[in-house]
Amino acid sequence: MTFFQAVILGFIEGLTEFLPVSSTAHLILATKWLGIAETDFVKSFVVVIQFGAILAVIWLYRKRLWQEPALWRRALTAFLPTAIIGFLLYKLIKGFLFESELVILLALTLGGLILIVFERWHRAGEQNTISAKQALIIGGAQALAVIPGVSRAAATIVGGLALGLSRRAIVEFSFILAIPTMLAATSYDLWQSGASFAPDDWFLLLVGLITAFISALIGIKFFLRLIERRSFIAFGLY
């Protein structure tokens, strides 16, 4: 992987992580289209650079995270289903699903159709607070995103809207939920493969992290403005 390729992948990660379009699928397909070899480092790279996007969420929501401890409890509750499934299926995900373009394309297509159908016929809710039970259900929806091609953001958004939450409430909760989810995925992957990283690999990771942080700041602000004026149908079509 070159410096330029690391910048491109970091930009894609940050910009797409919080949009309902599956950042993982974009990264996997981008590595193939850029001709990047499917090494263990590259597989870890597309996971680890998510930490840059995590930092962007923490930075933008730092005051709210400090002032609303209940929000943390709801996010941790929602994180549990993904943690359990991700841990149990880690080897399957890394060894097979990440390499299957068919799985990715099918998941992208199905996810897009669900988003379009749901947005077209579902009536928007008004609820702005999330109960522990609702958080757990949203977490169950997010667990589907362990499959490459299934958008974590789309899964949580559809789950939240189905429970009657307002668009902004579930979108912002999806951002917050990303913190424990992506932090755990990043940390576990580093623990599994960090010892095999060469010095140059660590430099490329840093490049990807910084680029992902900057582009995530842009992506989050863009998405929040967009949902005030537009539906999610455009993302489903995309």
Question: Could you say what each language-model-derived stretch is?
Answer:
Residues 1-238:
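Multi-pass membrane proteins that catalyze or facilitate reactions on polyprenyl-/lipid-phosphate substrates
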